[in-house]
Curated annotation (Swiss-Prot):
It catalyses: L-cysteine + L-glutamate + ATP = gamma-L-glutamyl-L-cysteine + ADP + phosphate + H(+). Belongs to the glutamate--cysteine ligase type 2 family. YbdK subfamily. The lineage of its organism: Bacteria, Pseudomonadati, Pseudomonadota, Betaproteobacteria, Burkholderiales. One of its GO terms (molecular function) is glutamate-cysteine ligase activity. NCBIfam families: gshA_cyan_rel, PRK13516.1. This is Putative glutamate--cysteine ligase 2. Its EC number is 6.3.2.2.
Length: 371
């Protein structure tokens, strides 16, 4: 199968995708209701889209093509409200969070769609274990080579996105010690991790053709990279974030990525090399394990600082681009998180410490999703 032609798109436009948990309102475990939700919303009018995901206990919402923080926030609120209304009719709850705190993966039911059934047959139990919930952000790119430049430039900031969005400290009734345990589920897939260091679309086409010829992949969907190009959309897709507990947080993180993209493509502050990835896995682990308190190492200078400090320094550098995009309010929220060194994982642990119940913690996640 040939690689799709890269469709040039309007630079720095963006779209947001959120995978959402569907829970019962008895004990707040995951429940099977995606098909029923899809049936209820099929005639509803809302921006963007709502689609099923790999199991019946999750559903995905996505915005249209956005240009500003206000637009993204408005669309996310409208789609969220549509889904919440349908969920109320079914007496089920919806919430964010990268993992469900106490669900048992073996109880999950794969959604009845050809690709999901194929994934289940190929990956076995990993498919059901993949009932985890992420935020993806697409960024429009003017051409294919710019997309690859942006992909590898953006990789330096992967720890920021993980730490800011982290909302998955609990797995199967256990505090994992991680801020984002969700990404540990992604690591199990053979084509996860980072994209190959290729800076021209011609070179990327050659790489893709070789992979297809091995029989390992059929399409770009088979790559579970942290950031991957989406040629049919003319975007790169940042895929490392946990689904935040609120759409407001999701919009702020998306606009941080949008503003970074403008800075990286217009100012071109980084000289890219394969050596940029020497500390990639270390920095990624630190963000997953310790959140904003984690350490990140600059691959070019060797300087070590906390991820929170690195975010605050980055916000100063990209401030002119935030002004140009109208994303100052979003970046103020990001700065407040970095200064306080708290994220949604911190909030979940605080609630559990107060309530001594993961069931109650998930119930409060559902309340927060409505805010």
């Amino acid at each position: 199968m040939a690689l799709e032609t890269f469709v040039n798109s309007e630079p720095f436009t963006f779209g947001v995708e959120l995978e959402i948990q569907i829970v019962n309102t008895h004990n707040y475990d995951l429940t099977k209701a995606a098909s029923d939700l899809m049936r209820l919303i099929k005639d509803a009018k809302f921006p963007g889209n709502i689609t099923p995901e790999i199991t019946e206990s999750m559903i995905e919402l996505s915005t249209g093509i956005c240009r500003t923080h206000d637009q993204a926030l408005g669309e996310l609120h409208a789609i969220r409200d549509t889904l919440v209304s349908a969920a109320d009719q079914l007496n089920v709850g919806l919430c964010g969070g990268g993992t469900h705190a106490f669900q048992q993966w073996s109880e999950r039911q794969i959604f009845d769609a050809p690709r999901f059934q194929y994934i289940s047959e190929l990956y076995g139990y990993l498919a059901k274990q993949f009932t985890v919930f992420g935020q993806h952000v697409h960024i429009g790119c003017p051409d294919a080579d710019s997309a690859l430049f942006l992909l590898h430039s953006m990789s330096r900031f992967i720890p920021h996105f993980i730490a800011l969005s982290a909302s998955s400290p609990y797995v199967q009734n256990v505090d994992t010690g991680f801020h984002s345990a969700r990404l540990n589920s992604v690591f199990a897939f053979p084509l996860s991790g980072r994209a190959p260091f290729v800076l021209t679309w011609h070179g990327f086409e050659e790489y893709f053709t070789k992979m297809v010829n091995t029989g390992v992949v059929n399409s770009m969907k088979d790559f579970y990279w942290d950031i991957r190009p989406k040629p049919g959309y003319g975007t790169i897709e940042v895929r490392v974030m946990d689904t935040p507990l609120s759409v407001d947080r999701a919009a702020a993180i998306a606009c941080y990525i949008q503003t970074l993209a403008r800075y990286l493509l217009i100012d071109r502050p980084l000289k890219l090399s394969e050596d940029d990835y020497l500390v990639y896995t270390f920095n990624r682990f630190e963000a997953c394990r310790f959140g904003l308190e984690g350490t990140c190492v600059n691959p070019q200078t060797g300087e070590r600082r906390t991820i929170a400090e690195d975010i605050l320094d980055t916000l100063d550098r990209i401030a002119p681009h935030a002004a140009a995009l109208g994303s100052r309010a979003a970046l103020d929220e990001i700065g407040a998180l970095a200064k306080a060194r708290v994220n949604d994982a911190s909030w979940l642990r605080t609630i559990f410490k107060q309530e001594k119940s993961l069931n109650e913690t998930v119930r409060q996640q559902c309340l927060r999703w409505r805010e």
